[in-house]
Amino acid sequence: MMSNSSSEIDVVKTRIPTYDEDDDTILYAYETKPEFVNKEPNIVSDASCNTEEQLKTVNDVLIHCQVIYDAMQNLDKKIDVIRRKVSKIQRFHARFLWANRKRYGYKKHSYRLVKKLKLQKMKKNEVYETFSYPESYSPTLPVSRRENNSPSNLPRPSFCMEEYQRAEPEEDPILSRTLSPVHPSDFSEHNYQPYYASDGAAYGSSSGLCLGNPRADSIHDTYSTDQASAAPPSVTRSPFENDGYIEKGSITKHPSTWSVEAVVLFLKQTDPLALCPLVDLFRSHEIDGKALLLLTSDVLLKHLGVKLGTAVKLCYYIDRLKQGKCFEN
């Protein structure tokens, strides 16, 4: 017999007949239903199916993780390429700035040197203001005249350079700017030839007479005829006496043979207002005649730190010097 705890739903109860008529005992046979017999194998198959699904899910997750990893690797490679390009651009920019930096020279690196240069410039300006020039030596600068530099206020007749030139028709062409163009090979061998007027006064006929040397104390656009007639020949001096560093006859040679001091004299005589500030610069760089003829505007602006207007004027005078027309108006 089956226990009472067994469920009647899970089993099949069958009555067993007895052959004893006097016995009232009833026998039953219990059998398990067929559907419950195969129940346990079904549970095992379901578990195996769940395991396969879990493995498939894990594989999918791993595949997605691999895809994400590959994408991150590609992104890192692209970032490295971008960094290399950015660094290349930065190096190119730095090299460009270094190659095109403004070369103003040494004026900005030393306060004492700048102060010294300013004082020298102020002194030169004062010297230029105290002297007058018979004509303008630059196509852009007006003629500057001295109002009154003489201690006496008496009216004095003007002295014309043309009369002086007519008195010496065979004078060296470099002595006057009003004559025709002159080639440097046509210069005379003597810088200073005294000219004696009818009253006995001597006037220097040097090349600095018409070139406006600021330190020449014997050249004026106006002067007193009484004082000139009373002055002895030894009183009037050559304008180059203060320039003791100039070799005799050096300015009359071909420009390619000029020394540094001859080039300095050329700057002073050609355009004192514009070119005299370059005297110290030319001396420090030891620019002689050959170097002067090779100067260009780029060299003056970038390497020597010369201002644009001054560089243009100097290149203009150098071109005229090459053509033999430097002293032509």
Curated annotation (Swiss-Prot):
Name of a matching Pfam family: SAM_1
Tagged with keyword Methyltransferase: no
UniProt keyword annotation of Phosphoprotein present: yes
UniProt xrefs under Gene3D superfamilies: Transcription Factor, Ets-1 (1.10.150.50)
The GO terms describing molecular function are: chromatin binding; histone binding
Tell me the domain of life. Answer: Eukaryota
* Keywords on record: Nucleus, Phosphoprotein, Repressor, Transcription, Transcription regulation
Q: Which GO terms describe its cellular component?
A: nucleus
What CDD domains does the annotation carry? SAM_Scm
Residue ranges, annotated region (Disordered):
138-157
- Quote the InterPro entries the UniProt record gives: SAM, SAM/pointed_sf, SAM_Scm-like
Per the record, residues carrying Phosphoserine are S138, S238
Q: Where in the cell is it found?
A: Nucleus
Domain SAM as annotated: residue spans: 258-325
Question: Which GO terms are recorded in the biological process aspect for this UniProt protein?
Answer: negative regulation of DNA-templated transcription
Family note: Belongs to the SCM family.
Q: What's its job? A: Putative Polycomb group (PcG) protein. PcG proteins act by forming multiprotein complexes, which are required to maintain the transcriptionally repressive state of homeotic genes throughout development. May be involved in spermatogenesis during sexual maturation.
Protein's name in the database = Sex comb on midleg-like protein 1
Organism ancestry: Eukaryota, Metazoa, Chordata, Craniata, Vertebrata
